[in-house]
Amino acid sequence: DFIDSQLIHVHTTARTGIQLEDIKDIVIHYVGNPGTTAQNNRDFFDKDDTEVSSHFVVGLKGEIIQCLPLWERSAASNNRNKDTISIEVCHPDGTGKFNDATYTSVVKLTAWLLKETGLSGDNVIRHYDVTGKLCPIYYVNNPDKWEAFKKDVKTSLAELKEK
């Protein structure tokens, strides 16, 4: 109930309808355009000429919009589109740091996805880990904060498994 499903339409690159081969990792991204909302980014993915997409976008108020079914490929992580679920995250400024509401929702969503897919907390990676792109920039520039994020996801996953 915490996810607002607004699937984008099938078109060219952003949503091809091609099935994932397997799900091996959850990839965290940042949108790269400070101050934009989850809805802004979802609507951008839905344009016919857009060549990128993500399974989820997490907004500045902590809202979560699902853009693609979990079983379909996104256009977000280059050669890893075939085996990853991608989460794009909104941020208020150029540092790329997530605000508290956004951070809380990203942790919750990531843990839920790990539980749903049977993956572990070790299966959470940055776009940077796939391509070397500075994404999400805050967590590339602050590896200690990335480790803290992954620890928070593992804690949340453990709590979900207890329920």
What are these regions (language model features)?
Residues 32, 80, 85-95:
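Cell-envelope and extracellular/periplasmic
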Residues 1-9, 13-16, 20, 92-163:
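Basic/polar, cationic surfaces and motifs that engage anionic cell-wall
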